[in-house]
Design a protein with these regions (language model features):
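Preference for long, amphipathic alpha-helical scaffolds in soluble/luminal domains
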Residues: 1-307
């Protein structure tokens, strides 16, 4: 069980410290449920734009909209995808610069069928994790109604409907659980008008894959208990994806939640286990505001008796 509730004053005060306006912003919005036009939220978001990292990221953007040396390679460490993902994580407001970046990303990595490819726009470069994971970011940047993004949603629903949808060829033809997390993340922001019986069936199938998986947290899945910044493929990511679709009340969810709760320290904080080498936001093996924020996001979805 959680040693502290999500509303714990000490923990919230730590997350609300002005030194990290991005964590402060998301705490105000997602934990305290302040509206976007709240004066404190607006002030904090203004502070986000003044952060040196945000200014540096935009300074590295090319006039054509992309990041990195080659617009056709958005998946490189300093490429377009990484920059847009980080700006999204930091809570930057959408503007013409982020729109230009999204246009570049869509131009150079979206296959004509709607999926996102690791190899320019080739179908062979599309894996279970490459499309769904980008959709929340694109919706954040205001492209939820863009026909190109709509096609990407349609692709995820159709692609994940196949019996072998999670076989990416890298795990001896076993299900790629990372792909399940990515697809669930994408379908969590599926526009209401696009939701259907088929999309609900896909969500149910993907959720069952994650909840019924035979995890080996002493062996193959040991790294799933190491929580990274930015968020990577781990147990916390899986539970957040499941919770976004209402599975926090599922009996299979509870024992996995206990493993996440067991990782907190005596003050109810979670450590950062891995960081980005290109844009490190925190230090490894230290109490992490970002990981703690995500853990609290998870706890807000869980019935109090389960914490």
């Amino acid at each position: 069980m959680s040693k502290l509730t999500p509303e714990s004053e000490e923990r919230l005060a730590w997350l609300l410290e002005p030194e990290n306006p991005s964590v402060r912003y998301w705490t105000l919005r997602d934990i305290l449920e302040r509206p976007e036009d709240d004066p404190d939220v607006c002030k904090t978001r203004d502070a986000i734009a003044r952060q040196p990292l945000v200014q540096e990221l935009f300074a590295r953007q090319h006039p054509e909209g992309h990041w990195g040396d080659d617009p056709a390679k958005p998946y490189t460490a300093e490429g377009t995808l990484g920059a847009l993902s980080l700006l999204h994580l930091l809570g930057v407001r959408p503007d013409e610069r982020t729109r230009a970046g999204c246009n570049s990303l869509l131009r150079f990595c979206q296959h004509e069928g709607g999926g996102f490819s690791l190899t320019q726009t080739r179908r062979s470069g599309i894996f279970p994790c490459t499309t769904g994971e980008h959709l929340p970011m694109l919706v954040h940047w205001g492209l939820g109604d863009d026909p190109r993004v709509r096609r990407a949603f349609e692709f995820v629903v159709a692609d994940m409907s196949a019996d072998d949808a999670l076989d990416c060829g890298r795990y001896q033809h076993r299900d790629c659980l990372w792909g399940a997390i990515a697809a669930l993340n994408g379908l969590a922001v599926l526009p209401a008008a696009m939701r259907s019986r088929q999309s609900r069936q896909v969500v149910r199938r993907l959720a069952d894959r994650l909840l019924d998986a035979k995890y080996d947290f002493q062996g193959e899945h040991k790294r799933w208990l190491t929580f990274g910044v930015p968020r990577v493929w781990d147990l916390l990511s899986a539970l957040l994806a499941l919770a976004a679709h209402g599975y926090a009340r599922d009996p299979r969810f509870a024992p996995l939640l206990e493993l996440v709760l067991a990782q907190q320290d005596e003050r109810g904080r979670w450590r950062c286990g891995s960081v980005s080498r290109t844009w490190p936001l925190e230090k490894r093996n230290r109490p992490s505001k970002w990981v703690t924020l995500d853990a609290l996001r998870l706890l807000t979805t869980v019935p109090k008796k389960s914490r």
